[in-house]
């Protein structure tokens, strides 16, 4: 891919996690890499088709502290995608948007995968619901320590979504991958937050415990690796 990238190339990695654009930047010395996140419920089928659940697919793009030239590239991407019928919003504070979704996934993906429970099963169990809250709080505290502009209202909105908005039968991609014995995004949804919590000296005992437990499940009998 490096040989295809020039100074005017614009790359928009649409991937899970808090740092995919930074990782792409580490591989490339040219071009503009734009951070992004997407809100969508979709999964791949055995025949390689993709099923989208619900009716939303909202993409956000941006670069933190973008220069004037970078912002023009971001706006060009937004105009291009909106013109193609893709709901795309350009965000000045893209890291806040990324982390609002990432904090949710640090709880949503991790706990559904560990217990192989739906969201309805988690929130109907007081102990598991309390663990979900702890996972959210730990990721939120890491975000604050990193200087991300998240506020208590954002954390509270994530918890409100858990208790009152998510469907009872909702599952996660990590849960489905672990159950099927496929490669997983455990490092994306759990390993990264545990690593950052240690680096920043932020206590994250529930995240650390579940990361260890899921790691054992994923590697049991060579059943599944991690991406």
Predicted features along the sequence, with ranges:
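Short amphipathic alpha-helical interaction/hinge segments
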Residues: 44, 114-115, 218-222
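Generic structural signal for helix capping and beta-alpha/helix-loop junctions
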Residues: 19-21, 43, 98, 160, ...
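Internal alpha-helical scaffold of NAD(P)-dependent oxidoreductase catalytic cores
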Residues: 3-6, 27-32, 47-153
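Rossmann-like NAD(P)(H) cofactor-binding subdomain of soluble oxidoreductases
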Residues: 1-49
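Gly/Ser/Thr-rich helix-start
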Residues: 18, 63, 182
